[in-house]
Amino acid sequence: MKDMTQGKPLKLIICFAIPMLIGNIFQQIYNVADTVIVGRFLGESALAGVGSTGTLTYFLLALVSGMCNGAGLVVAQCFGCGNKERLAKTVTALVWVAGVLTCIMSLIGIFGAEFFLRLLSVPENVIGYSAEYLHIIYTFVFGSVIYNGCAAILNSVGDSKTPLRAVIASSVVNIAFDLFFIIVCKMGVAGAAYATILAQCTSAVICFVKVWKVRAEIGLSLMKWKPEAGYIHLVVKTGFPAAFQSCMIALGGMSVQRLVNSFGSSTMAAYVAANRVDSVAIQVIVSIGTALSVFTGQNIAKNQYDRIREALYKTLGVMVGASIFIASMVLIFRVQLMMLFLDANESGEAIGIGCTYLTIIGVAYVIAGVMQSYQNVIRGAGDVNTCMVAGLTELSGRIVFAYLLSGILGVTGIWIATPLSWSCGCIIPVIRYYSGKWKHKRLA
């Protein structure tokens, strides 16, 4: 556990972000491994089918993950001011809320898979792959939920190393079983799904064991697992804006996915592969932003606004430098990166489409870095409603720009919509920060 209320802000943020960054990259690596192995050994249609499930999976889990993130803000602020009793009651309430929501979302995912896939206009030649993958993932979704809940608690009290170890272990498990199930056992798309489930359960066990070991330090007790209505309300109140924002982002992703699907399986495969590259590349920005949010949460509990301001401005400098470096790497190696997923002889068109996507997204990483910096200060301070509005603004921009520009520029218009939506997402957090109103939104 790490106290961020003392010491040099930037050093604390970077030291906290590095394990998280490595963990996030490993988490993305096993997503990439799924994509590479499916694309190389099962073909373009299977890749498009598995890839088209991403927004659906995210949508149905967004409510639970949003609650975990919202409760994490309260945990960070309780830890910052040393209120163990309030921290423990918040965690207890989170367990009950997440448990109920997981059961509901799992049933919806299992029985509604085909309906949602047809709603997304998934082509007939890939819908079978998509449905098979979703049924397995949602039958065993509890592993992902336990990991996300425990990781949120550990990150909030300054422990980013345990989630790192969990993700590294799960990545190894995922890659090993991907190869075994798909290549050796010839299980097809089902093999990729089962490998993912085993990986998620591995990370869940590691993080749960760590939370169990430090339960006394953060005030948890086996005798106090009865939920209190006031804390259930607190978790729902703080988690709902994040959950709602996540759901809306997922809906936006589904809208964009539906638009992408209308251009055919080659475009779908290109979108899946390029998205995997983008997801890995942007983790530096995401990890530093998350660390800044935890730093803000702990320091606002002690009214240390000068430290938060110093952290923001220094983090912005790091974000800009990191964004330029990452963009350069993506632009230079974009063709080689796409060829990791797709065979140049069989999927030349898809590789070209994916390279265009990476070029447009890469040059806009600086905008994403600025957006993440301001949004995470506001989020860490507990101003969750402003974050929700900012997220909805970004989402609305993405959908509107995608549908407008695709009619003029074709699929390239969809790619351009993302950096334009990031620009929209910057406006509200920047205005809110300089208004100073976020200083009065602390949760603990």
Describe the function of each predicted region.
Residues 68, 136-155, 163-171, 192-205, ...:
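Short runs within selected transmembrane alpha-helices of multi-pass transporters and secretion channels
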Residues 47-107, 144-163, 270-332, 368-390:
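Small-residue-rich hydrophobic transmembrane alpha-helices
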Residues 6, 10-29, 33, 56, ...:
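Residue-level signal for short hydrophobic patches within transmembrane helices
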Residues 59, 174-178, 204-208, 280-283, ...:
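Hydrophobic transmembrane alpha-helices of multi-pass small-molecule transporters
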Residues 1-17, 75-142, 184-240, 296-364, ...:
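Short alpha-helical transmembrane segments in multi-pass integral membrane proteins
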Residues 20, 24, 36, 73, ...:
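Transmembrane alpha-helix boundary and packing residues in multipass membrane permease domains
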Residues 15-34, 136, 147, 170, ...:
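Transmembrane helical elements of multi-pass membrane transporters/channels
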Residues 25, 29-48, 117-124, 180-187, ...:
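Helix-terminus/linker motif at the lipid-water interface of multi-pass membrane proteins
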